[in-house]
Amino acid sequence: MSYSIGIDYGTASGRVFLINTTNGQVVSKFVKPYTHGVIESELNGLKIPHTYALQNSNDYLEIMEEGISYIVRESKIDPVNIVGIGIDFTSSTIIFTDENLNPVHNLKQFKNNPHAYVKLWKHHGAYKEAEKLYQTAIENNNKWLGHYGYNVSSEWMIPKIMEVMNRAPEIMEKTAYIMEAGDWIVNKLTNKNVRSNCGLGFKAFWEEETGFHYDLFDKIDPKLSKVIQDKVSAPVVNIGEVVGKLDDKMAQKLGLSKETMVSPFIIDAHASLLGIGSEKDKEMTMVMGTSTCHLMLNEKQHQVPGISGSVKGAIIPELFAYEAGQSAVGDLFEYVAKQAPKSYVDEAANRNMTVFELMNEKIKHQMPGESGLIALDWHNGNRSVLSDSNLTGCIFGLTLQTKHEDIYRAYLEATAFGTKMIMQQYQDWHMEVEKVFACGGIPKKNAVMMDIYANVLNKKLIVMDSEYAPAIGAAILGAVSGGAHNSINDAVDAMKEPILYEINPEAEKVQRYETLFKAYKALHDIHGYKKANIMKDIQSLRVEG
């Protein structure tokens, strides 16, 4: 019997899973928050801009080393039987290293320089660079722009590199390699310097046929092309292929066999499709956590405005993978819960329940529209379909009678409406949606929210029995790399997670939500582009520390 390891690096924590490659059974798991968390307001006591979201890469090694040691010890599995390791990671999460793959933030002189640290996916400090990249692409009619939804996000790799070039050239001077954090973990495991086609294709303006778009980079700054060529470009390994064996020293350190194979890293949300078994077209999968990614597969490459990218073979070989998303979902609900009145917090504590459970109890019998509220869920910008990280959230319909649970429900509904905008965009561009899957901790824990989604989308909603689909998906790739299965599809069939429950839409609720959605779309269009300057002008008054 063989086993594989899936290491899942999320926004706030990391997970290491040991999986039976025959039946997908979770043999052992390790979950730990990052020691330094997300660095957002201060770095070593120094204030940093509110658009920044950084991390300390030492936390990633801590997860890997402690996690693998734990699952091997706890499971009592002979390491010889662990055939492969797969990695998934939030993206685009960028790391800057020296020639030995050591992160430059560990250098003493850069300890307090935020640009030396890992730039987490939700770091929006490169918004000016993203705008410049977009405008240059538009002016020069770059054909690839349609593959990225006709937009450029500050969350992607190239704008973040430009940000460091512009604002911290001393960091760039000391940097030998720039890569996705997922690639960094793979390279640390194998002592190689490779890149995954998934990370490059979705986040770095790279295509298998043409490579990087140096013609565009040259028009922005010839130095940018040189940085990409010297520090980013490396041999590319496709999803489903093998990077190589564990480095001997790393195998000894982790207590694993040096024959253990390592797969290329896959973006965390994309790994979820493998983990739940969504491997066909006409299926939209919502990977719900801090944010939500909306993923689809298709045999053709369509140029869908407002999506985050389309890459061939980034999840399943020969199929184009499509990604869209919402930047604040779990984060938004957590924000609302933290604003709950003390009486709600006390009631929840007295009844031995969470604030979320209390608010769900209060709203579960409300009909759509009963509160009179509607909201825009842009507290961390809008990724799809407006592709504008500078947009901000709004709520409409407040009265002196509005209760906190009404606000909570309005935000649940807002995220569902945002998902419907994305689903309709896919459908408008020749990608039919017949099934909708939901996976992650939120769907499993929040049936009230899933009921709202089913009725807003007017689709049967299939909720998967897994909080950890990305880790399962990563382990599936590890199993393939280790030879336990001949193909990704075979591994998915054997190891995928089961269905927890299904929800069918209800006609009356669907009709009421259609009315609310029209109002949402009107507000979306007004504040998203027709008069987006209203909230942006207010935001411009904020003073950076």
UniProtKB/Swiss-Prot annotation:
Record keywords: Arabinose catabolism, ATP-binding, Carbohydrate metabolism, Kinase, Nucleotide-binding, Transferase
Species of the source: Staphylococcus aureus (strain Mu3 / ATCC 700698)
Superkingdom of the source species: Bacteria
A GO CC annotation given for this chain: cytoplasm
Pfam families the UniProt entry points to: FGGY_C, FGGY_N
Protein name from the UniProt record: Ribulokinase
GO BP terms, alphabetized: L-arabinose catabolic process to xylulose 5-phosphate
Enzyme Commission number(s) from the entry: 2.7.1.16
